[in-house]
């Protein structure tokens, strides 16, 4: 990655933003992992786009190390999770005037899945977030 004079806003993914800030700080992946208390392989997977979801507590520690806010490194999906998935799912369902069963049918999941999302017991995957929310951003 050649960061040159690039702005972090240029990067769309969490992985690219993490890599950008790490390079700006002149740190190795091992150094970041050691500072935030995770395995190097875990941190490496963060920069290799091997995941959609990033634990916010870890991202907050990484962001602090980089001297930025966690919201500077997360993408829209992880921001959705940070801002409270449960309330957002329920608000959208109520806005569309759909029952949980109708909303589930519309989205292609079970009513139990909708309940889990609305109660914060289950995390909505990025695939379903894109289907349900991405077009509204």
Question: Which residues are covered by each model-predicted region?
Answer:
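A short, Lys/Arg-rich alpha-helix, primarily the initiator
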Residues: 2-24, 75-95
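Intrinsically disordered, low-complexity regulatory/linker segments
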Residues: 14, 34, 53-54, 66, ...
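Residues within the helices of the helix-turn-helix
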Residues: 19, 30, 60, 90-91, ...
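The alpha-helix within a helix-turn-helix
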Residues: 22, 33, 63, 93, ...
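Short alpha-helical DNA-recognition segment
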Residues: 26-45, 97-113
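Recognition helix of helix-turn-helix/homeodomain-like DNA-binding domains
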Residues: 37-53, 78, 109-123
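DNA major-groove recognition helix of helix-turn-helix/homeodomain DNA-binding modules
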Residues: 57-72, 125-137
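Helix-turn-helix/homeodomain-like alpha-helical modules used for DNA recognition
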Residues: 82-128
